[in-house]
């Protein structure tokens, strides 16, 4: 018998067959988890951008509709210890010694009506109308035909020189156009 048939047969490149198998990389094993996390982050970012842009749109719409109400810091002290003066009036609900009480309604200003004609400026038109400028014109025309508007005189000369910004400050609500025109 030949001993050839009983000899084990070894492959020529025995080292290649017994080389250790490398483990898969981190990305290949967790690829789907990483992709899902990226998609979720993108969705969250898109939702946040949408929410903030809608807030900006709502704020812009509120400015356009002129519905913004500003707080009057002088409202509580506005009529505290004020003595009534001839030719001026206070709003309903305002008392002379009510420090700490909020004043309701729009206060009347001490601004005298001018002899200038009414312009197309909505802020000054409203201020003149609040002081009785155009409303006093018919009464003034009958009393003094040459003077279309009456001039209110008060004892307090500082109130006669009140600016338009101070008049706006005394109001409870302002519109966007009021603020633009007061600058």
UniProtKB/Swiss-Prot annotation:
Biased composition (Polar residues): 111-122
Ranges annotated as biased composition (Low complexity): 130-143
Cellular compartments per GO CC: host cell; host cell endoplasmic reticulum membrane; host cytoskeleton; membrane; viral envelope; virion membrane
Matching InterPro entries: ASFV_p54
Region Interaction with host DYNLL1, annotated ranges: 149-161
Region annotation Disordered: where it falls in the sequence: 81-157
Annotated membrane topology: Single-pass membrane protein
Entry protein name: Inner membrane protein p54
Originating species: African swine fever virus (strain Badajoz 1971 Vero-adapted) (Ba71V)
């Amino acid at each position: 018998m030949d001993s050839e048939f009983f000899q084990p047969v070894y492959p020529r490149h025995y080292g290649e067959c017994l080389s250790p198998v490398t483990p898969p990389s981190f990305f290949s094993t967790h690829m789907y988890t990483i992709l899902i996390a990226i998609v979720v982050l993108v969705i969250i970012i898109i939702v946040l951008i949408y929410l903030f842009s809608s807030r900006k749109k709502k704020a812009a719409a509120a400015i356009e509709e002129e519905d913004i109400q500003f707080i009057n810091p002088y409202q509580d002290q506005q009529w505290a210890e004020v003595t009534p003066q001839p030719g001026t009036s206070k709003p309903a609900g305002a008392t002379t010694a009510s420090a700490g009480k909020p004043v309701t309604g729009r206060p009347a200003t001490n601004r005298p009506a001018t002899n200038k004609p009414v312009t197309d400026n909505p802020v000054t038109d409203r201020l003149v109308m609040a002081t009785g400028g155009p409303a006093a014109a018919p009464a003034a025309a009958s009393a003094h035909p040459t003077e279309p508007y009456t001039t209110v005189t008060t004892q307090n000369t500082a109130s006669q020189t009140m600016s338009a910004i101070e008049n706006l400050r005394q109001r409870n609500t302002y519109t966007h156009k009021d603020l633009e025109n007061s600058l």
